[in-house]
Amino acid sequence: MVSQFDTQHLPSSNTALVAGVDEAGRGPLAGPVVVAAVVFDPSQPRINGLNDSKQLSPACRERLYAHIVERALAYKVVMIDSTQIDTLNIYQATMLGMRLAVEGVAHVAKSARIDGNRLPKNLPCPAEALVGGDARDRTIMAASILAKVTRDRHMVELHLQYPHYGFDKHKGYGTPAHLAALAEHGPCLEHRRSFAPVRKMLTLEAIHARQSTHQHNENSPTKAAFNMLLERDD
């Protein structure tokens, strides 16, 4: 988890500071879901070029990432790994990440705006769910960029551990290339076993393993000797 809190540039106490919250990586078959919360001082100049992270090029996201972390009064980035996703389910894992992200900036923010139509339970401050918020609210746009860049960087690091899957290119999404690699190599520890394509692959692996074991037993010397004894008895 990454966080920052700028104590030296807090505005006056009567300024309504709002945290923008968004996630990246709910849909991929591998890797974490990442949630970010960002708080800006509304009295300061805006960062030019903010937008929904999905509408920006990787280079543009990286450039804006640097501006956001430099200018934010506070930000928090939370990573929920694939094991937690499989344990909780992706929805609950995302809600957990959102709650932790808001908690990370609650000492600054008086409220939060969260992209989507659902709010996590037990938030430390009042919150509003904003459908399409990553295209409507600048703090949510900033949060979407922090979450996306953080996750993309992490997937590039995972590629170094698991080079067979191409995580550096598709970032864990179920592209044809990823599905082909999954079929050839099977899932790794970073794959989400609760997601249908991965679960199906694990089922196929288990079937093949049982078939191989059965075939091995049928051809083993012990099995052959046992069959000979049966034939003699006949």
Curated annotation (Swiss-Prot):
Catalysed reaction, written as an equation: Endonucleolytic cleavage to 5'-phosphomonoester
- What's a Gene Ontology MF term here? RNA binding
Principal location class: cytoplasm
Q: What is the main EC category here?
A: hydrolase
| Alphabetical list of CDD domains matching this protein | RNase_HII_bacteria_HII_like
On cofactor binding, the record's note says: Manganese or magnesium. Binds 1 divalent metal ion per monomer in the absence of substrate. May bind a second metal ion after substrate binding.
For this protein, the record's SUPFAM superfamilies field holds: Ribonuclease H-like
Q: Specify whether Cell cycle is a keyword of the entry.
A: no
Q: What is this protein called?
A: Ribonuclease HII
Species of provenance: Xylella fastidiosa (strain 9a5c)
